[in-house]
Every structure is written in structure tokens, then in C-alpha cells.
């Protein structure tokens, strides 16, 4: 039983925050509690405030790190419900920290109201709050004469919250207030309610009735105990309950001892109904400042950790990979990328891009923002890690990479990148999404097929075309070359310039979407993606030759691939020289190759090989971790004709592979 006056706080150990799911033996220590100084006499320097209302008093925003620490023994809470996970017992004072209302509620204005009074009032004065609030409750729910009828019409989702207060929130508030009066003096009443009663002309009168009941039941003097009513979310005039603002502003006309706490400029969550964490802090400070002035003290604000503001240059432009209608991601002229995501409930958001992680910063409006270092030109995958889980940025187009759907951003090159961009006046080919049945795997499979612009012209109705089978890399899929690689634009531009002959390009999944699990051994490498080879040879090629106007002989069939797709290209072409006459790899994942004996000694007779393979090309990036320079050197020493190029300033990335494709295709199907 709490006694008449407050003494020092018991239990010197700090609060241990443990998950609620842990066993009782591992739960946190009980919160610090107050002891008594004098028995039977209220402490005149212990100021108590009653807090009631609906969801914005209950608290809707997730508390952040600065909200979870107690401001010390001068700010106390008498819980209105038991909260075992925090060691709280109903009716027993403890140090106040979020959440104040009930388990699973959020940050409330009362949190920073108390902190503001601690900062503003003399050190010998303590602050205590009693907090009873229910999301969505009508003001009738706090009227003793109306509660029984209200219980009959209350929505089902509210009944559990009502039951937490024994179906009488007003009675719970008064019972605890009477107990608290043995320890201190009630100095004010804080209310945030009205959204549910928007447009109700009787609302102000019912608020006055609640206030009068409290004053009567607790023997309070109205001239000494004001009611402080916070206004609703405004959201620049677009708040869901903006119609309630006027009736709250006019409350003092009915209740002369009330004061309205402005919510102008208080930030809100995306629902435009509830404040976000920054908005609750600001509104809470305003409650505290109003009370401090009423008590005769100059208000002082507690320290609030403000979000770091990220300035976006005026010349920053929306990335081409951004979903239309979104403002972010953006890129500036230095190649820095700017990201923003609305995540008002998130604790931590991290941007993961280009092998670097950036802690995203709150902007005070429910968003997280980040700016990167200058990024290399080209395409980059990225993820947003929210509370420890990777998510795709909803503002960006999606791309299959990293073994899953991913976010991506393009950092643009200058005019040197025009070869992979669509150009006005250049006829555009088609990229078709097709499904075909694989007898090898007894299932339907998906492929992408590029046909040149002239393929559909009536004059070419009988013309046949050579085919390039083009493979993606590990962790990607058949859409990679047309989405990340811009293959179709490379083909269109090269064909329009007369640099490449019109050809069909077929892109299929190489069965290497999932991570490589074969271990660091030759057998594992040989097996990874090998299931695709019989599908390609026995299902896909026959399907393409049957359904498209192809030239179906080996002289008119090429294969190329990037990274592991280059490995697959070697495996397929070098063991099927009766079916392919052209070969290319871009950052090809070709390891441990003994050129003298590989593939049954296919390179041993250079003259014979050079007759069968009309053109062989290998490229890699200057900063690539997979380089083919040594293999090229060894092949040339054997007399094998192989063209090669090192892409300047690029790594194992799509810009390397775009360049490789652009350099490869002009040599195809020409004798």
C-alpha cells in the first residue's frame, strides 16, 4: 500500500528490457518505485495529473529509443492496469516510461508532458500521471450515467480494451485518483478526445459533464484544476477528423476552465488520424508548457533528439528506375542517390547498396531518408532493411537479382551510354514473354524472346533469322538481360546503325536463381545449373525453331552469357560444336580450366577449333573479381582465335555486360 508522501526511489537496478515472450524467470526487474516520507499526509510537492481520452491519448506511434528511457524519479506513473512484462502493478507508483497506457500501446502526449514539467519545475517537485484511454471511445464512455448503454453498442474490437478497465474507464480513473490523492495533489486534467464525436453538437457539454464529475468525485476546486484539451491531427487541413478542430477550439466557451493545446504543425502518421512519434513529442511538450505557465513557471523544454535533415539538391532528378508517381529515389549530378520510405512504426531502417550500409534518418514526418556516397555509373541492386528484415523499396521497379526480387537504381552515364538507351527514330523490336513445355523436366518453363523491328514487316514474312541464346548470371533470371541489361535497346541501336545483323535473341532461366550450394569443388560447380543443358538442347531450341522464323543450322546459332551464364556457355557450346558456331562470355565464371585438356581437349587442335567457332569473345571489368585475362592468354598461346576486352572502370556488374554485348553482336553471323 502506497503511503502518504514520496521518499527515495527503491530498486537501484536499471530496467532490463526483455522480450515479452521470455519466461517469467527472465523478465525484467520491477520498475523503480517511490517510498514514503511522511505517513498520512499528501506531499504538496507531488503534482498529479489525470490523463484520459481515445487513441491519440492512448498512444499510437511506436516509441523510439529516446522515449523508452525513464527521465528519472521525478516523473512517476500510477499504472491503470497490470503490466507484468515491465514489472508494473496497477495502483503502484513507478518511474514513467513508454508505454504509459497499457501493454501494446504506443507513445502518448503524456510522456513528453511529464518530461517538460520535470525540466520546467523546481527539482523538489515530482510529477505523477494516471493514464486511462481507449482507442475510438466516445466521450459517453467516460460518463457514469452512459457507460452501461455504451457497452451495448461498443464495437467488438473495443471490448477487450474496455474490459481492461472492468468496463468502466471513468471509475478506474477516479479510483486510482483517490488513491493518488493520499500521496500528492491533483493539479490538472489532460484530455485528448473528440475524433469519434466529430460533428456532435453535444460534445462540449458532455466534456464539461466529465470534468464536473471528476471535480465532484475528487473534491477538486475548478479554479485550481484546469482541463487541457489537445487538438486533433491536422495534416495540413487533410486530417481525417479535421472537422473536429473547430469544436475543440470552442470548448472554452462551454467549459471556462479548459484550455486548448494547439496541434498546429504537429507531424502525423500516414493514416492522417494519429500523430507520429515526433508529433506526440511536440504535442506533449505543448501540454507541459501550458501547465507550467498556469503554475507560474517559465516553461523549459527537455532535450529532444531531432532527426538529421537530409538536404536534396534542387538539381537532383528522379531515377529512371523509380516507379512513376514517386518522388524518390533521386540522383544528383555527383552520382549520390537519395532514398525515402514511409515507415513511421519502424525502429531502424538501413539502406544496403554497393556493398555499403547507410543508417537511414527520420525526417520527423514518419519517413526515413538516406543519401549515399557518390555511386559508380550503371545499375545497382539495393535493399531496405527494416527492423532487421530486408524489404524491397516500394518506390522502385523490381529486378530479379541476388537470388530474389530486388530493388534497383540506375546511376546514369553520359552520352557514352546512348547505345543501351532507346533512341527516337530507331525502330524498336519486341521482347516477348513466352511459356513452353519442357519434356526434360515435365513442366512449363518461361523464356523471353527478342525479335528485331523488321521481323513483323509484311515484306519480311518469309525471311528467317539467326538466333543468339543469351544467358544471365547466378542469382538472376531470364528477365535480367531485358530489364537490367537493356538488351533490346542495344540490339535495336546496333541493327539500326548496320553494325549488327538482325537476329532473334532468346533468354531463359539457367536454373541458377537459387544460391550456389555445391561447395568449392569441381563437382559442385559442374552440377550447378547443369539441369538447364538438356532443356536448352532438347526443348528450347526445338521450340524456338518451330515457332519462330529461324535459321536452324549451327552456322546461325550463337550462345553467350554473363558470369555463371558464361560458365554455362562454355559447358554447352564446347560440348556441342555441331549446334553452335559463335561463343561469348562476359565476366565468365570459368575457374580451374586446363585449356589443353578441358572439354575432351577441344582446344588442342587450334585449326579445327577455329574453323568450327567463327567468333569467340570474352570481356570482364577492370575492377572485376572474375577476370578472363589469363584464360585468353593461354588460349592464344595454343593458337585459338579469341577476341577480348577489359571494360574500363567497371566491376562485376551490368555496365560491364552491356558493353560486352554491344562489342560482341557486331561480329555475329558474318563471314
UniProtKB/Swiss-Prot annotation:
InterPro entries: AB_hydrolase_fold, Esterase-like, Ig-like_fold, Ig_E-set, Mycobacterial_A85_antigen, SASA, SGNH_hydro_sf. Keywords: Carbohydrate metabolism, Hydrolase, Multifunctional enzyme, Polysaccharide degradation, Signal, Xylan degradation. One of its GO terms (biological process) is xylan catabolic process. The keyword Hydrolase applies. Optimum pH is 6.5 with glucose-pentaacetate as substrate. Active from pH 5.0 to 8.0. It catalyses: feruloyl-polysaccharide + H2O = ferulate + polysaccharide. SUPFAM superfamilies: alpha/beta-Hydrolases, E set domains, SGNH hydrolase. It comes from the Bacteria. Residues 297-671 are annotated as: Feruloyl esterase. Residues 1-296 are annotated as: Carbohydrate acetyl esterase. The keyword Transit peptide does not apply. Pfam families: Esterase, SASA. Is predicted to have two esterase domains corresponding to distinct carbohydrate esterase families, CE1 and CE6. It can be hypothesized that the release of acetic acid is related to the CE6 domain, while the release of ferulic acid may relate to the CE1 domain. This is Carbohydrate acetyl esterase/feruloyl esterase. It comes from Xylanibacter ruminicola (strain ATCC 19189 / DSM 19721 / CIP 105475 / JCM 8958 / 23) (Prevotella ruminicola).
